[in-house]
Amino acid sequence: NFEAAGSAVTYDSTSFCPDSASTATSLSTGYKTYSGTINMDETKRIEYETITEQVKEQLGYKVGIITTVNLNHATPAAFYAKVASRNEYYNIGLQMIESGFDYFAGGGMLQPDGADGNQENIYDLAEEAGYKVIQTQAEAARLTAEDGKAIIIGQHLADSDALSYDFDRAANEWSLADYVEKGIEVLDNETGFFMMVEGGKIDWACHANDAGST
């Protein structure tokens, strides 16, 4: 029942076989870049404006980011961060908090204490910035719009702190659809909202030649 649909060509500046960072940059900004780079040009000095920034700042929309993989992985990161390398996980996490976006849900953060484990914890910083950090399904189920900005980390994490493959998911374990449904519930408002939803583990399964899990 959507009023419009769109498509994008996602080859990047140098490759017809690009990675998630450059392809997600194409989707979130409309611009090409090198593989491994998120929302910056080929010189890695000029930053691109994202669609999420535009709808938040110009239209007053609420914004939600949902994925089955880590919240600071390349695809979700391309809708709130700008980094020269997709491997800057801690920096990406900081930019997630700084975005002020309203709803994040998915797998756990990669390197939440920094690459060397000596930085202030990302989840603690998020709470200091006014986010409600949720790590149980029961608490996620109780979340309402009145709770304000929220970050939901899946309770039942699997490989690399991502959500389980749907193939392996327990009957009482939330699916991607459940996190989307909760997102719609808390983001819904008269002005409107933007939601980026990624089934990221489909990609992981294909990399592993695991047809069953796709």
What is the role of each PLM region?
Residues 44-48, 52, 56-63, 70-72, ...:
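Well-ordered, non-transmembrane segments within structured domains
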Residues 66, 106, 154, 196-198:
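A cross-family glycoside hydrolase active-site/sugar-binding cleft signature
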Residues 99-102, 110, 148-150, 154-171:
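Formylglycine-dependent
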Residues 85, 89, 172-180, 213:
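Phosphate/oxyanion-binding active-site loops and adjacent basic polyanion-contact surfaces
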Residues 74-80, 157-170, 183, 188-192, ...:
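Active-site His/acidic residue clusters
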Residues 1-115, 120-149:
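N-terminal catalytic scaffold of extracellular/periplasmic and nuclease hydrolases
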Residues 134-136, 140-152, 179-200:
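Active-site regions of oxyanion-processing enzymes, predominantly non-cytosolic
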